[in-house]
Amino acid sequence: MRPARRFLAALACVAGALLSACATPTPRAERAVLREVSAQFFLGGRMSASDGNQGASGRIEWQHDTAGDEVTVYSPLGQIAARLISSPTGAELLTSDGQRYQAENAEALMPRVFGFGVPVSRLAHWVQAAPPPGAEVRELDAAGRPALVIDQGWRVDYLEYPDTRARTLPTRVEVSRGDARIRLIIDQWELLQ
């Protein structure tokens, strides 16, 4: 090979190496940990919700199973602010002022709980860091767990896991879309399967 061709070949190799070093790495599928969603769980913790204009915070307890959901939201002083109970036949919201609202499903009542709509069926996946079908995992942490998921216009950030085990459930989750934002600090997890 002539010196000029060797030089061009070497230059092409160096340029290729430099360009690949500048490329944004994408999470490798084989690095991702397969996470299965639990059909039954209980979580307890602290939460805050804001629609950009108004916000509220308090405690939350959520019992989820195949028959439905029971979500109780407590005020910062520990009083029940709202209780949402859903089943395949419908949903009911009871508020601290004695109001009772009914709808076909829990999602229809979420604006009364948080001030904006939230897809409850997908939220059950999100809190477990088990993205539902169609969700895009944009970032993984060092253990191969979701760090950022985009799903139906919602951004789900996993801010903390309690340890480095691959299948550990998250303890800090932030869900947002536009000005709507829910922050969860989960103090208690129970998988009930």
Curated annotation (Swiss-Prot):
Keywords in UniProt for this one? Answer: Cell outer membrane, Chaperone, Lipoprotein, Membrane, Palmitate, Protein transport, Signal, Transport
GO CC annotations? cell outer membrane
Lipid-modified sites (N-palmitoyl cysteine): C22
Provide the GO biological process annotations: lipoprotein localization to outer membrane; protein transport
| Compartment(s) | Cell outer membrane
A Pfam cross-reference name: LolB
Q: What is the recorded membrane topology of this protein?
A: Lipid-anchor
**Which residue positions does the secretion signal occupy?**
1-21
Report the InterPro entries cross-referenced here: LolA/LolB/LppX, OM_lipoprot_LolB
Function comment: Plays a critical role in the incorporation of lipoproteins in the outer membrane after they are released by the LolA protein.
* Subunit and partners: Monomer.
Protein's recorded name: Outer-membrane lipoprotein LolB
